[in-house]
Amino acid sequence: MGRLILEHTLQGHKGRIWGVAWHPKGNVFASCGEDKAIRIWSLTGNTWSTKTILSDGHKRTIREIRWSPCGQYLASASFDATTAIWSKSSGEFECNATLEGHENEVKSVSWSRSGGLLATCSRDKSVWIWEVAGDDEFECAAVLNPHTQDVKRVVWHPTKDILASASYDNTIKMFAEEPIDNDWDCTATLTSHTSTVWGIDFDADGERLVSCSDDTTIKIWRAYHPGNTAGVATPDQQTVWKCVCTVSGQHSRAIYDVSWCKLTGLIATACGDDGIRIFKESSDSKPDEPTFEQITAEEGAHDQDVNSVQWNPVVAGQLISCSDDGTIKIWKVTE
């Protein structure tokens, strides 16, 4: 069995902390929350400390933050219905663009693998795709409305310009750009959860997706492409996503976030029961019927709901979490 070892407990935000995001280099992270501020943290020696506080970009709670793949830009999604784009081009972080268009709270933001596209989603049930048109210029490329309820999360595929979204309507949607007319279309709807889908994340090569839900389960989905050896039908030559594994019984309340480590293959969950749990694929797992087992858990990882977990993209086994209790924690996971 593995271990979840607490390395650092950090404070600074006032109120609940909604999101944390590692910089691509893994030596810096950003956090955001109820206090309308973004904090940029870095490691000096063995001490994490706040280097910058960005407090003038939003008028309400900041729900999520994400670094661009190049690490030069930071996007923040807020309940004030805007998304802010920050950069450090002048030496200090500045808000260089504010993206407007959503009618209600923006819940999530995500950069594509190239950094050339940005996706946002909102309580207004829509998903927006933005093109980075140049220096600090963003153009709306698509407004997508296939969900029937609040959209909780958007995540780009790690190797292709494919977008996944998760919603209060219990579904996950996949989007891709049609090569002929350049229109963005919903290419797949993933149904199996029986309540809100809070979080989604791709594995390292993007052939599988993990989702977590209010129904207290996590599910593993696999992509079946046209001509697949499993014999799964692919109507209209479109990739089909099938639920190949459901992990249940470990969580007692809603699972708010899930992160699939691109370095180790481990899956971490953030739960409303204050716990963090780590799952590993079994050694005898089959591609079309994989099995995942819980290798370690910290039942009282935080004093209140755990809102976000994210694996460090560079340091294998390092995990960050944040909570309604106003703390950020950095963990070391051993197998």
From Swiss-Prot:
CDD domains: WD40 (cd00200)
GO biological process: one example: iron-sulfur cluster assembly
PROSITE patterns, A to Z: WD_REPEATS_1, WD_REPEATS_2, WD_REPEATS_REGION
Pfam families xrefs: WD40
PTM statement from Swiss-Prot or TrEMBL: Conjugated to URM1, a ubiquitin-like protein.
Listed GO CC annotations: cytosolic [4Fe-4S] assembly targeting complex; metallochaperone complex
WD-type repeats, residues: 12-51, 57-96, 101-140, 146-185, 192-231, 250-289, 301-335
Keyword presence, Repeat: yes
InterPro entries tied to this protein: CIAO1/Cia1, G-protein_beta_WD-40_rep, WD40/YVTN_repeat-like_dom_sf, WD40_repeat_CS, WD40_repeat_dom_sf, WD40_rpt
SMART domains for this protein: WD40
Keyword field: Repeat, Ubl conjugation, WD repeat
Tagged with keyword Ubl conjugation: yes
PANTHER family, A to Z: CYTOSOLIC IRON-SULFUR PROTEIN ASSEMBLY PROTEIN CIAO1-RELATED, WD40 PROTEIN CIAO1
HAMAP family the UniProt entry points to: ciao1
Protein's job: Essential component of the cytosolic iron-sulfur (Fe/S) protein assembly machinery. Required for the maturation of extramitochondrial Fe/S proteins.
Similarity comment: Belongs to the WD repeat CIA1 family.
Record protein name field: Probable cytosolic iron-sulfur protein assembly protein Ciao1
Organism the protein comes from: Drosophila melanogaster (Fruit fly)
